[in-house]
């Protein structure tokens, strides 16, 4: 009887350790999801900014070509 109680206590300890570990991993996962969401938002903004810069550069090059043609 004593042996089975000891085994039960060990099992209980291992289960509690696993539960604690799972809780920590869930918190870490939530943090990573939040960080990923922020990075996706930042990436979206940077892509839009890049497109805007490309459009402005094309417009400037177009004006320079027009000036070159009119000379």
Swiss-Prot record:
Gene3D superfamilies, per database record: 1.20.5.340
Membrane spanning residue stretches: none
Entry's Gene Ontology cellular component terms: cytoplasm
Main location, first listed in the record: cytoplasm
Location(s), subcellular: Cytoplasm
One Pfam family matching this protein: ZapB
Keywords (A to Z) from UniProt: Cell cycle, Cell division, Coiled coil, Cytoplasm, Septation
GO terms under biological process: division septum assembly; FtsZ-dependent cytokinesis
InterPro entries: Cell_div_ZapB
Known function: Non-essential, abundant cell division factor that is required for proper Z-ring formation. It is recruited early to the divisome by direct interaction with FtsZ, stimulating Z-ring assembly and thereby promoting cell division earlier in the cell cycle. Its recruitment to the Z-ring requires functional FtsA or ZipA.
Oligomeric form and interacting partners: Homodimer. The ends of the coiled-coil dimer bind to each other, forming polymers. Interacts with FtsZ.
Annotated protein name in UniProt: Cell division protein ZapB
Source organism per UniProt: Aeromonas salmonicida (strain A449)
């Amino acid at each position: 009887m004593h042996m089975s109680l000891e085994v039960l206590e060990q099992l209980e300890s291992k289960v509690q350790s696993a539960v604690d570990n799972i809780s920590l991993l869930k918190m870490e996962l939530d943090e990573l999801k939040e960080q990923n969401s922020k990075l996706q938002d930042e990436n979206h903004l940077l892509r839009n900014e890049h497109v805007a810069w490309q459009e402005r550069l094309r417009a400037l090059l177009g004006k320079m070509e027009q000036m070159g043609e009119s000379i």
